[in-house]
């Protein structure tokens, strides 16, 4: 079925195929699957390299604040730079209407420098990205070709290993990374897709979009996977990697308001008064990745068939082989390339560093009478103490047990005690006492269980402390 958003564009489609050639980058056609399809009815050719004006900005631990311009067509620029052959190289490619200089890609490089020695190359193709979306979709073919040309130059001119190359791309940048990887025969070590763009790519042939064959290892973070119509989702719901992560279900991110108008965030001063907008959900993917560099343990992805099953704790705790870390350290997962389209879910925090640690709480009640109300617990750990989390609301019956999963924004450490609180709902003329006889806390990461006991009962809104049994 023809996507509704393409109906108007279909009227502009042309029939006759055309081709344009750009020297060492090769030739580019407007034939299928690149154009003239249901998703891509408008037949367009990519702009020239001169018009796109792609720049490769090299940052290293030696020059974290000031980039060095390098290019594959002039190997001397690489040899004269701080590029180090004994380090990994991470390319970061921005998406539609965005830029790399003085923006999130260069900030991400700086975070990497805190944990590793690395060549960090930001790919700035702002001129090609600030076009009509359908034109920008075609322009990434040239940017991908230029990126592949530079990587090939590193290999042939300097003997650099393709397996040490990691290409990170956001939105259209994810498919740009795919084009580079495809041109290099899928031999680059890793590609990370940060909410790969959906329009013009969802369900399209592998040749035009990101897929697992584009690199030795492909990991993907989906944060805005609702349909473009009517939800204005800019990402893909399609699984396109070896590991596909769907934080918070992959559609609505905590801290991003659901009202369409209020979820719109402008880029670069609304592109100097002219350009378009991207959604908060779409941006979250690179924010999560960036945070994961310094907070590797706060983004564990749980293998699960669906987000609903994950929320119901049907995929808890992590299996014996462990859970992969979404983001920078996903490549540490032993089973990363054992299959394609491996699916993982997790919840994140609303703001700050977005980290989250998942626990399953089981509470057994004690007392003498049934009360209608709710119960809350707080964790007290060797690192920090958590806020109170609601575990259950409804009929509170003595000897009844209630189980709930919670997501804590930080690592509390070894849990030393828990505190229980209850409150009644509605009118109750008596002054009942209720307590928790046992609370079990299970860690999602390794399945460790902590058991706490008490024989006390307390009045409403009075904290009860439970210690190890």
Swiss-Prot record:
The keyword Metal-binding applies. It catalyses: a triacylglycerol + H2O = a diacylglycerol + a fatty acid + H(+); a 1,2-diacyl-3-O-(beta-D-galactosyl)-sn-glycerol + 2 H2O = 3-beta-D-galactosyl-sn-glycerol + 2 a fatty acid + 2 H(+); 1,2,3-tri-(9Z-octadecenoyl)-glycerol + H2O = di-(9Z)-octadecenoylglycerol + (9Z)-octadecenoate + H(+); di-(9Z)-octadecenoylglycerol + H2O = (9Z-octadecenoyl)-glycerol + (9Z)-octadecenoate + H(+). Its EC number is 3.1.1.26, 3.1.1.3. It is a peripheral membrane protein. Glycans are attached at residues 353, 428. Gene3D superfamilies: alpha/beta hydrolase, PLAT/LH2 domain. Residues 93-105, 257-279 are annotated as: Required for galactolipase activity. Disulfide bonds join 21-27, 109-120, 256-280, 304-315, 318-323, 453-469. It is found in: Secreted; Zymogen granule membrane; Cell projection, Neuron projection. Coiled coil: none annotated. Residues 1-17 form the signal peptide. GO terms for biological process: cholesterol homeostasis; fatty acid biosynthetic process; galactolipid catabolic process; high-density lipoprotein particle remodeling; lipid digestion; phosphatidylcholine catabolic process; phospholipid catabolic process; triglyceride catabolic process. The active site is at 171 (nucleophile), 195 (charge relay system), 282 (charge relay system). GO terms for cellular component: extracellular region; extracellular space; neuron projection; zymogen granule membrane. Lipase that primarily hydrolyzes triglycerides and galactosylglycerides. In neonates, may play a major role in pancreatic digestion of dietary fats such as milk fat globules enriched in long-chain triglycerides. Hydrolyzes short-, medium- and long-chain fatty acyls in triglycerides without apparent positional specificity. Can completely deacylate triacylglycerols. When the liver matures and bile salt synthesis increases, likely functions mainly as a galactolipase and monoacylglycerol lipase. This is Pancreatic lipase-related protein 2. It comes from Homo sapiens. The gene is PNLIPRP2.
């Amino acid at each position: 079925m023809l996507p509704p958003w393409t109906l108007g564009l279909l009227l502009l489609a042309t029939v006759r195929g055309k081709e344009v050639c750009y020297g060492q980058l090769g030739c580019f056609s407007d034939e299928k699957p690149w154009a003239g399809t249901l998703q891509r009815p408008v037949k367009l050719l990519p702009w020239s390299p001169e018009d796109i004006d792609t720049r490769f900005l090299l940052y290293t631990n030696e020059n974290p604040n000031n980039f060095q311009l390098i290019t594959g067509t002039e190997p001397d620029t690489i040899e004269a730079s701080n590029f180090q052959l004994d380090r990994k190289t991470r390319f970061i490619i921005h998406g539609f209407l965005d830029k790399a200089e003085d923006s999130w890609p260069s900030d991400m490089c700086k975070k990497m420098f805190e944990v590793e020695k690395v060549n960090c190359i930001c790919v700035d193709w702002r001129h090609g990205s600030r076009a009509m979306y359908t034109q920008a979709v075609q322009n990434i073919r040239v940017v991908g070709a230029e990126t592949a040309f530079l990587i090939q130059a590193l290999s042939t001119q300097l003997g650099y290993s393709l397996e040490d190359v990691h290409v990170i791309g956001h939105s259209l940048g994810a498919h740009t990374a795919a084009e580079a990887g495809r041109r290099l025969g899928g031999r680059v070590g890793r590609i990370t897709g940060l909410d790969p763009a959906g329009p013009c790519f969802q369900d399209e042939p592998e040749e035009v979009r990101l897929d697992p064959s584009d690199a030795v290892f492909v990991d993907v973070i989906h944060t805005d996977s609702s349909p473009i119509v009517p939800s204005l989702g800019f990402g893909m719901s399609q699984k396109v990697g070896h590991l596909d992560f769907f934080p918070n279900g992959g559609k609505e991110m905590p801290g991003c308001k659901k009202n369409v108008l209020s979820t719109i965030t402008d880029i670069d001063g609304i592109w100097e008064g002219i350009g378009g907008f991207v959604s908060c959900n779409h941006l979250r993917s690179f924010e999560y990745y960036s945070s994961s560099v310094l907070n590797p343990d706060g983004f564990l992805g749980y293998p699960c068939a669906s987000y609903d099953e994950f929320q119901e704790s049907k995929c808890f705790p992590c299996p014996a082989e462990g859970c992969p870390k979404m983001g920078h350290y996903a490549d540490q997962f032993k089973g990363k390339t054992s299959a394609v389209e491996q699916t993982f879910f997790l919840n994140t925090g609303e703001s700050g560093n977005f980290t989250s640690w998942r626990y399953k709480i089981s509470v057994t009640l004690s007392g003498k009478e049934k009360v209608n109300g709710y119960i809350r617990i707080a964790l007290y750990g060797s690192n920090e103490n958590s806020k109170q989390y609601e575990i259950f609301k409804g009929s509170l019956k003595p000897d009844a047990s209630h189980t709930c999963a919670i997501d804590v924004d930080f690592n509390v450490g070894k849990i030393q005690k828990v505190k229980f609180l209850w409150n009644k709902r509605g009118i109750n003329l008596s002054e009942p006492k209720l307590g928790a006889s046992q609370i079990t806390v299970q860690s999602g990461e390794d399945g460790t269980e902590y058991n706490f006991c008490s024989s006390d009962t307390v009045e409403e809104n009075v904290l009860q402390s439970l210690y190890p049994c």
